[in-house]
Design a protein with these regions (language model features):
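Bacterial N-terminal signal peptides
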Residues: 13-23
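Sec-dependent signal peptide cleavage junction
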Residues: 22-34
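Predominantly the structural core of cysteine protease catalytic domains
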Residues: 34-40, 45, 76-88, 108-116, ...
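Alpha-helical support elements that line or immediately flank enzyme active sites
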Residues: 100-125
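Aromatic- and Gly/Pro-enriched, solvent-exposed loop/edge beta-strand patches characteristic
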Residues: 385-475
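Beta-rich interaction/scaffold domains
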Residues: 521-590
Length: 590
């Protein structure tokens, strides 16, 4: 009996060894993979806003728990009773009131207003040539409303095939999530002078898809604004600048003689239909300032910049009660300015995801140039809005790697993340150096808290027709998920069948994990600029875009950054294309 037991024990051990070494996730037929639920990000359209489909349409003013009230009071202790970004020690950190006209681009005006404010609040450099005719920074809402909703088929772009289909594209509506995901993918912010709303009918050039005069480093999103959330928003306003937010706008904007006040309590967050910019607050703004037939219970209101033009009531500003029942989707956008060339490695060019709580996910990339991996980015879905604990690991893979962890671990970092939005984890101190041609992986795990086994939701692109028509592309060897202790190619996971014979993951695409690499070669490549400038100065009657782009390109100095050179060349290519002198994608790889 002992010999037989020893034989079977060796057989079982051998079988387990075989299973653990299966290449890139080939599971034996008898194995039951972990098949967690898929949560699609579903939205419904309320005028110019896309709001979560499961939000209640009717609600009373949210109840505040004792814990929330205590937390809010602790945070509020260090905050002033009033604050306005329009006047911080004599300086304004808000750009002028814009007019969205008849478009549904309120979400883009609010998001980019937050970006502009953050850049000003940080004191980032704003060259004179980047300012509009009124002398201020002015980003293109049209570009942000166009490219995420437009397919692009550029050979070599790993996000080709990732987009959303909507009638009239982003003019039909959007939200801060779409704005954040688009900016994270490198779609803007573009300058208004090179992608004017006036050009919407003829469209925008693919040459300009990735024109970005600054880079969005991260975003934070509060889906619901409770009492504790008010304190968070106030802190954001003081730390980072203006905050995008959404609310139901079909109530009465009451003119009390001194200001415009807005409050209603019949419609909840599910009815939110308009995005605006929070630029300040006043705890003592009297409840008596609101219309007598519908007044909040307490004093206090947000100072709001609208996007209905400076000729609108209040000069484009109004006060919104703290108790506004529909206030939601508060978002801030943190911007940065790169002085040296930066490469963004990504597969997720989409702006809409599905969420699955797999144990871990990984993306595998190939370094196009030598450089230092300085940042990893990933989204925290609204289902993870309470925050969580992340673990990021980076591997340099073997030539014959059989999984995304089959190689040398270059670093591992853990920590907490808060709120929804697109997160940015700095790996600057980890000194992760990559050589051209290196295959490397970025592995992401999300848990409820440190030491917890409770998994949080990981985000993946999705092909879905629910609410919106979403498109994504994926290839073998790009994204992997961990099921138990086995790494499996997402292309294979898409074929898994559950006990009902359905394929719950068939719509999934790549994992939303990005790697930011600061390139080692800092010499500026002027090849595209030279190619664009070779066509010479435009005629006096040439297209305005061509003229503006030529002026920008001609004004560059020898110490221009790679980003400045790339933006100028792309704008000039777009102008040449508009004139019929070239066709996309000519010169794109110059």
């Amino acid at each position: 009996m002992r010999k037989k037991w020893a034989y079977w024990r060796r057989a079982v051990i051998s079988l387990l060894c075989v299973i653990s070494c299966l290449p890139w996730g080939q599971l034996p037929a008898a194995a039951e993979p972990d098949m967690p639920e898929v949560l699609e990000e579903t939205w419904k359209q309320n005028d110019g806003l896309l709001v979560p489909a499961n939000e209640p349409a009717q609600t009373d003013t949210p109840e505040v728990t004792d814990d929330e009230a205590e937390e809010s009071l602790r945070g509020a202790g260090s905050l002033p009773s009033s604050y306005s970004l329009l006047d911080v020690d004599g300086s304004s950190y808000v750009t002028s009131v814009k007019d969205q006209g008849s478009t549904g681009l309120c979400w883009a005006y609010a998001a980019l207003g937050s970006c502009e404010s953050n850049i000003m609040k940080q004191g980032l450099d704003i060259p004179e040539s980047w300012k509009d005719s009124s002398g201020e920074l002015n980003f293109s809402e049209a570009a942000l409303g166009w490219y995420p909703f437009t397919n692009h088929l550029l050979v070599g772009d790993l996000t080709s095939g990732d987009y959303i289909t909507m009638d009239n594209k982003g003019i039909s509506g959007g939200n801060p999530t779409i704005a954040g995901y688009g900016l994270a993918a490198g779609i803007g912010p573009q300058l208004e002078q090179f992608a004017s709303m006036d050009d919407w009918s003829q469209g925008y050039s693919e040459y300009q898809r990735y024109n970005a005069y600054y880079r969005m480093q991260s975003s934070d999103l509060l889906q619901q604004v409770d009492t504790a959330g008010r304190t968070v928003i106030k802190q954001w306003l003081m730390e980072s600048g203006a905050v995008s937010a959404s609310f139901y706008s079909k109530g009465i904007f009451f003119d009390n003689g001194d200001s415009i006040a807005y409050y209603q309590k019949r419609h909840g967050t599910g009815d939110a239909d308009h995005a605006v910019l929070l630029v300040g607050w006043d705890d003592n703004y009297s409840r008596e300032n609101f219309q007598k037939s519908c007044q909040p219970k307490s004093d206090g209101a947000w100072l709001v910049r609208n996007s209905w033009g400076a000729d609108d009531v209040g000069g484009g500003y109004f006060w919104l009660s703290y108790e506004e029942a529909s206030l939601c989707e508060a978002a801030r956008f943190q911007m940065t300015q790169d002085s040296t060339p930066v490469a963004r490695y990504q597969y997720d060019g989409s702006v809409s995801y599905a969420n699955v709580n797999f144990s871990a996910a990984a993306n595998v990339f190939t370094a196009e140039k030598s450089g230092k991996l300085t940042e990893v980015m990933f989204p925290m879905t609204s289902n993870n809005s309470q925050g969580g604990w992340y673990t990021i690991s980076v591997y340099r893979l073997k030539n014959n790697a059989q999984s995304p962890v089959d190689g040398t671990k270059l670093c591992s970092k853990q920590g907490t993340v808060q709120y929804g939005g697109y997160k940015n984890i700095s790996l600057e101190a980890q000194n992760v150096m990559l050589q051209k041609g290196d295959r490397f992986s970025v592995v992401l795990e999300l848990r409820k808290e440190k030491g917890s086994r409770e998994k949080l939701w990981l985000s993946f692109e999705s092909n879905s027709t629910e609410t919106l028509e979403r498109h994504c592309s994926i290839q073998s060897g790009q994204t992997f998920i961990c099921s138990g202790d086995t790494w499996i190619d997402m292309v294979d996971v898409k074929q898994w069948q559950n006990s009902s014979g359905k394929k719950p993951y068939s719509n999934l695409g790549n994992a939303a994990i990005k790697a930011i690499v600061r390139e080692q070669d800092t010499a500026v490549n002027w090849a595209q600029w030279n190619a664009a400038m070779s066509y010479g100065e435009p005629a006096a009657d040439a297209d305005p875009l061509y003229q503006a782009a030529y002026a920008e390109a001609a004004a560059l100095s020898e110490d221009a950054t790679q980003a400045e050179v790339d933006n100028a060349a792309a704008n000039l290519f777009a102008g040449l294309e508009r004139e019929g002198l070239i066709q996309y994608s000519q010169y794109i790889y110059a």
